[in-house]
């Protein structure tokens, strides 16, 4: 053996050539090296619910009960993001969203070096397999072990996983191991809780800053993108206008003509259309007259139908508080245009027009309530609706002013009732079984012309074998992630509704991310599942004198 060859073998042995694969071998399919990094004093942001503002500032602790960050055992952890405005969106109390309250945003920082490991996929089974981890132990528990940190930490004291916050968004979501998260120092960034029932208003005002640098979706000019509105002023002006409207002679007379619950829906809409036209003659709403020509939503028939539908939902004994607001507000196609009224007010006082539009909307809904038997004082009903419509205005306005992105359909879109829906990729349309773990499926949704609502989604399930991961199922609109409220119905179907109103069309696209969890490796056969399609429900329409939601069905395939 030559000296040169011996030296080469010796160097190869010292460098590990011929030894077992390195920590990163096989990881390229799940790890994005270009977005992974090591940082000293790594910081991120976390949104906290009302009631936990004081406790979180004392340090991060794993909750003893609840979801502990996620329903899926693999993904239980402390969640944060690089965008403080996105973090603010998690400060609302989901159990009592109509309280008006919000918590806070905190900045959390690790001491020393932290490795951020960026993932390309969110399928825990695939990640564990490609990284050579145990397939039976929860992913995030393994991330906190010394072995994992030694293999993937590049000399750092800990490893934090990262995933895109939502499709179309440049923000990132960080998943921290609970034990590792105890080392985080906590600093208050902004406190919404001190505003009481106005906390959510402060939160939305704060979040509006997030899109300050994005180009406006509409063509009226960039100066209207993310307008800095004073919501307290708008609320006060709105309530003043409502009182003025109620005492106005013609409006007062029209209110006295309000039909009762027994009147036909057609007569009810006719009355509300007349009421709408009468209200527009009020001098306090003079600015709106100059905008009506470019905003079709001010057609009386639209307002009338909207008000009737809102009233019917409010009157329902089975609807919960969330459904009585967000569901009601997303019934009528085109109602999203109300939120874009400021875009038609180029030469006017935008804040004034916003207040006027909310006042008129509130009065219409309050006047519709008696039509279905809800005996509520008109002022009280209108004031409560002010809270809801302001929140709706903010949510949709912020969504519309985010940069639009190409839907990137890779399968033929299904066109129906003005909507266009498709699977993102062929792989998304396949539900694979025969393994424990989770899979994500993306659906692209848009509308051909007028903005249309996405009211809810119906997902087929097999309890105990194929369940919906409620915490990871969401919908994103132009990069803004909106969580969904899901509940099981009829045992084998899960019903999910966006927690904030969602509209698509006119350049606005939505990405629905459905996450399924398999607690068993048992194979699933197609005849076991109640339906072979996912249903997307849109606006309400009347078919054979019966109200139904527009429904789009996307068929999937079961494979083992």
Curated annotation (Swiss-Prot):
Disulfide topology: 211-226, 486-496
Family annotation (InterPro entries): Diphtheria_tox_rcpt-bd_dom_sf, Diphtheria_tox_transloc_sf, Diphtheria_toxin, Diphtheria_toxin_catalytic_dom, Diphtheria_toxin_rcpt-bd_dom
Active site (UniProt): 173
Stored Pfam families: Diphtheria_C (PF02763), Diphtheria_R (PF01324), Diphtheria_T (PF02764)
Signal peptide boundaries: 1-25
One GO MF term: NAD+-diphthamide ADP-ribosyltransferase activity
Superkingdom, natural source: Viruses
Protein's UniProt name: Diphtheria toxin homolog CRM228
């Amino acid at each position: 053996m030559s000296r040169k060859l011996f030296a080469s073998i010796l160097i190869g042995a010292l460098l590990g050539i011929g030894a077992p694969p390195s920590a990163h071998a096989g990881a390229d399919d799940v790890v994005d090296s270009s977005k992974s990094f090591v940082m000293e004093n790594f910081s991120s942001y976390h949104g906290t619910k009302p009631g936990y503002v004081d406790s979180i500032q004392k340090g991060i602790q794993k909750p003893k009960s609840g979801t502990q960050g996620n329903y899926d055992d693999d993904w239980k952890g402390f969640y944060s993001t690089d965008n403080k405005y996105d973090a603010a969106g998690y400060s609302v109390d989901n159990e009592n969203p109509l309280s008006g309250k919000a918590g806070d945003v905190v900045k959390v920082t690790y001491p020393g070096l932290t490795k951020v490991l960026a993932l390309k996929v969110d399928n825990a089974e695939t990640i564990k397999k490609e990284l050579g981890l145990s397939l039976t132990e929860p992913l995030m528990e393994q991330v906190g072990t010394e072995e994992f940190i030694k293999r993937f930490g590049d000399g750092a004291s800990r490893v934090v996983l990262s995933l895109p916050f939502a499709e179309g968004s440049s923000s990132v979501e960080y998943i921290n191991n609970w034990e590792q998260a105890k080392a985080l120092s906590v600093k208050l960034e902004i406190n919404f809780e001190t505003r009481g029932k106005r906390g959510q208003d402060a939160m939305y005002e704060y979040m509006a800053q997030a899109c300050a640098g994005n180009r406006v979706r509409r063509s009226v000019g960039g100066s209207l993108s993310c307008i800095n509105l004073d919501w307290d002023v708008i609320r006060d002006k709105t309530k003043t206008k409502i009182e003025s409207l109620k005492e106005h002679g013609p409006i007062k007379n029209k209110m006295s003509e309000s039909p009762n619950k027994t009147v036909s829906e057609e007569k009810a809409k006719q009355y509300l259309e007349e009421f709408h036209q009468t209200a527009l003659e009020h001098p306090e709403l003079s600015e709106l007259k100059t905008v009506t020509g470019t905003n079709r939503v001010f057609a009386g028939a639209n307002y009338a139908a909207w008000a009737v539908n809102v009233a019917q939902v409010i009157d329902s004994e089975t609807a919960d508080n969330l459904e009585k607001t967000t569901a009601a507000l997303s019934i009528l196609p085109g109602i999203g245009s109300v939120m874009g009224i400021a875009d038609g007010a180029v030469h006017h006082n935008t804040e004034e027009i916003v207040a006027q539009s909310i006042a008129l909307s509130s009065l219409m809904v309050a006047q519709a309530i008696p039509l279905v038997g809800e005996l509520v004082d008109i002022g009280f009903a209108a004031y409560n609706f002010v809270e809801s419509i302001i929140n709706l205005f903010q949510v949709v306005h912020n969504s519309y002013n985010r940069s639009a992105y190409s839907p990137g359909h890779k399968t033929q879109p299904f066109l129906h009732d003005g909507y266009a829906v498709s699977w993102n990729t062929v792989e998304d349309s396949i539900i694979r079984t025969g393994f424990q773990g989770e899979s994500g499926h993306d659906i692209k949704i848009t509308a051909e012309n007028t903005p249309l609502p996405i009211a809810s989604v119906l997902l087929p399930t097999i309890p105990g074998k194929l369940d919906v991961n409620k915490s990871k199922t969401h919908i994103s609109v132009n990069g803004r992630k909106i969580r969904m409220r899901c509940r099981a119905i009829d045992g084998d179907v899960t019903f999910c509704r966006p927690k904030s109103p969602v509209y698509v069309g006119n350049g606005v696209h939505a990405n629905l991310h459905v996450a399924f969890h398999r607690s068993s490796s048992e194979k699933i056969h197609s005849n076991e599942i109640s339906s072979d399609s996912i249903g997307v429900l849109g606006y309400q329409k009347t078919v054979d004198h019966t109200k139904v939601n527009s429904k789009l069905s996307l068929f999937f395939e079961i494979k083992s």
